[in-house]
Amino acid sequence: MVTLYLHVPILLLVVITARAAPKPDTHNPFDELSSVAEKQDLHYGDRSRKDPFIAQNDVGNNFRDGTQENLTKVRSKVNQYDQPFTFKCPLGETIKSIGSIHDNHYEDRQWDIDCKPAGYTMGISTWSPYANDYDGSMNFECNEGSVVTGMSSIHDNYYEDRRYQLMCSYLNNWKRGSCAWTSYTTYDASFVELTPTGKFLVGMKSQHNNYYEDRKFKMLYC
């Protein structure tokens, strides 16, 4: 008996898929936070607030704004994690918004600060001494007639904390009038504070927590 072996060629089809080069990461978390406010038209923070910044709703980020007219995109960070920074508003401008994002890997915050025209003739500007020690509390206010126009900070990896200096600028013919503190922000949470219409940022309080290795902040607006 003759056995025939039939060799059938096997065709292998190799499909090569061309992949486009990955797009650069342009995600900006500050823009994401700001877009929430713009879309939902809300005031953010704790429902229990009893000041001119009373919140109507929560979004879980302790993200707050002053008034709808003041809503603005917080555009870019002013520091890298673990790195020092110094920020000053341009001459004749004051703080329009101040925002921050916390990172649990670095145990540090990135800050964003935006400015607006002061509407007053500006006099002398001075930097404060450091307003806090590492792991210590902060309770700072500019002198009467002056408003916050800058922030400087250094970070320490041993304490996983920052020390802060604030710059105050004198506004000619401006007096404080009515003032109000915001409520504290939340440890490990992002926040954006927008200066209410007709007000200025004049003070800041802060407390550090070693469990969270983070600070919570409250702002004084007049």
From Swiss-Prot:
Compartment list: Secreted; Nematocyst
Record PTM text: Is not glycosylated.
Entry keyword set: Disulfide bond, Nematocyst, Repeat, Secreted, Signal
One Gene Ontology biological process: collagen fibril organization
Propeptide, chain numbering: 21-75
Entry annotated with the keyword Coiled coil: no
Coiled coil: none
Top-rank taxon, per record: Eukaryota
Disulfide bonds: 89-115, 142-168, 179-222
Signal peptide: 1-20
Presence of keyword Repeat: yes
Sequence repeat ranges per the UniProt record: 100-109, 153-162, 206-215
One Gene Ontology term, aspect cellular component: extracellular matrix
UniProt family annotation: Belongs to the dermatopontin family.
Function: Is potently cytotoxic (EC(50) value 79 ng/mL) towards L1210 mouse leukemia cells, has hemagglutination activity on sheep erythrocytes, and is lethal in crayfish. Has no phospholipase A2 activity.
Protein name: Millepora cytotoxin-1
Organism per entry: Millepora dichotoma
